[in-house]
């Protein structure tokens, strides 16, 4: 027997029993985003490597350690580790944002070479939103309110907390960086080699360290909010006022900086305590300089991304009775001479007249006992049964597989009307 081939570590299959929950969550995401007037875009999963180096930052962990990169002839290419850079590239390339506002969303796989663990995988899926051309804090508030509406639709709104911060302008952040480095240089004895490297290359990332001793020290570190420029401070205060007005609860987290270099002003995360260490389910912020940095015109921008794997885990944890639709609603079984054609015709009739229902036709033969076992296993609500007598009398037997009403024999012309009363 040939050796079996396994999935790559950190890249997972989605089983037939799992996909209905994924589909339901993705449907809630699409419904909420479409209800706000946002438009879907689709980008390639492979981009030119310099796109991410320029957008995300060469000294970030994502670019320096986690990207899947390869050579195609003389061009270096990368499997996308996030969606914002590719969306900005597409918007510039196709002129979507020239003298124009755009509110866009996407869903798709991303790739990072990280250590796989619960809620963190090497291939993972994100739903992302990018808004271009709006500088006002109203759009910051809209994105946060939009995500809260999604949490309510998913039944997880009581299990997530909003954390907010402002990291100001590039100049304000540079001033803060100098103050933070000056403070941390006196505590290098508490740092790992990796943290010492960050102190030189990307000191703001030390603010979200998991080192408990360093966390205690950081409680007395300079606060980023104290270094904000006036414009960023006013922007942040207006955002907080808008969230207060619609009763969105939040915590101001002065250590929140996000892991990518392109952010400025508002940054936010939705976090949960229900998933252990992988507590962030959604994060984003403003990136007003990124479009110009990638060759476009100066364009105020803001976005977020949410991890679908973590949303699936969170829904399973806190909302296990979510009303996920079965993959099969109606199962058609048949046995005897002349029943095959009748069963095919009936299944197609149901699919044509009741397209919102999922109808499966038994195709693997066997007696009725075997077929009903398959029907039960499918999760269907109804079985439509055709035997030789039903063909002769132009009738169908309707069997309720989930209990409830008794089995009924109906004239073929009345079957569709009856099915409609059961769903």
From Swiss-Prot:
Substrates-to-products reaction catalysed: tRNA(His) + L-histidine + ATP = L-histidyl-tRNA(His) + AMP + diphosphate + H(+)
GO molecular function terms listed in the Swiss-Prot or TrEMBL record: ATP binding; histidine-tRNA ligase activity
Gene behind this protein: hisS
Organism encoding this protein: Haemophilus influenzae (strain PittGG)
EC number: 6.1.1.21
Biological-process GO terms, alphabetical: histidyl-tRNA aminoacylation
Main location: cytoplasm
Subunit structure comment from the entry: Homodimer.
Keywords, alphabetical: Aminoacyl-tRNA synthetase, ATP-binding, Cytoplasm, Ligase, Nucleotide-binding, Protein biosynthesis
Similarity section: Belongs to the class-II aminoacyl-tRNA synthetase family.
Class of enzymatic activity (EC top level): ligase
Identification of the protein by name: Histidine--tRNA ligase
GO cellular component: cytoplasm
The keyword Nucleotidyltransferase is assigned to this record: no
Compartment(s) where it occurs, according to its Swiss-Prot or TrEMBL record: Cytoplasm
Record-linked NCBIfam families: hisS
């Amino acid at each position: 027997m040939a050796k079996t081939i396994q999935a790559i570590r950190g890249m997972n299959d989605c089983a037939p029993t799992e996909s209905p929950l994924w589909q339901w969550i993705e449907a809630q995401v699409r419904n909420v985003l479409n209800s706000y007037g946002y438009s879907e875009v689709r980008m390639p999963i492979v981009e030119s490597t310099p796109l991410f180096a320029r957008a995300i930052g060469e000294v970030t962990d994502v670019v320096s350690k986690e990207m899947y990169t390869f050579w195609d002839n003389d061009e270096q290419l990368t499997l996308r580790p996030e969606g914002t850079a590719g969306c900005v590239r597409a918007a510039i390339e196709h002129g979507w944002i020239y003298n124009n506002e755009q509110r866009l969303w996407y869903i798709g796989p991303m790739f990072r070479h990280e250590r796989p663990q619960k809620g963190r995988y090497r291939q993972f899926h994100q739903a992302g939103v990018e808004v271009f051309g709006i500088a006002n804090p109203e759009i910051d508030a809209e994105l946060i309110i939009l995500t809260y509406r999604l949490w309510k639709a998913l039944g997880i709104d009581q299990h997530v907390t909003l954390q907010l911060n402002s990291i100001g302008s590039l100049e304000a952040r540079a001033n803060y960086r100098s103050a933070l480095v000056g403070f941390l240089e006196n505590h290098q004895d508490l740092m790992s080699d990796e943290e010492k490297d960050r102190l030189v290359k990307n000191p703001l990332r030390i603010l979200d360290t998991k080192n408990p001793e360093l966390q205690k020290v950081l409680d007395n570190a300079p606060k980023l909010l104290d270094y904000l420029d006036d414009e960023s401070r006013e922007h942040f205060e207006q955002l907080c006022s808008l969230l207060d007005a619609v009763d969105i609860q939040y915590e101001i987290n002065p250590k929140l900086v996000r892991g990518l270099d392109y952010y400025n002003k508002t940054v936010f995360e939705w976090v949960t305590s229900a998933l252990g260490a992988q507590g962030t389910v959604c994060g984003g912020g403003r990136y007003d300089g990124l479009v110009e940095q990638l060759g476009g015109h100066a364009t105020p921008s803001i976005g977020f991304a949410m991890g679908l794997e973590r949303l699936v885990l969170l829904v399973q944890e806190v909302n296990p009775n979510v009303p996920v639709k079965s993959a099969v609603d109606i199962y058609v079984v048949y046995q005897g001479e002349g029943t095959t054609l009748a069963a095919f015709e009936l299944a197609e009739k149901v699919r044509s007249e009741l397209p919102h229902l999922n109808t499966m036709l038994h195709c693997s033969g066997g007696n009725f006992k075997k077929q009903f076992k398959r029907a039960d296993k499918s999760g269907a609500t109804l079985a439509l049964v055709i035997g030789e007598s039903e063909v002769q009398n132009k009738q169908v037997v309707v069997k309720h597989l989930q209990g409830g009403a008794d089995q009924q024999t109906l004239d073929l012309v009345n079957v569709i009307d009856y099915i409609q009363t059961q769903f």
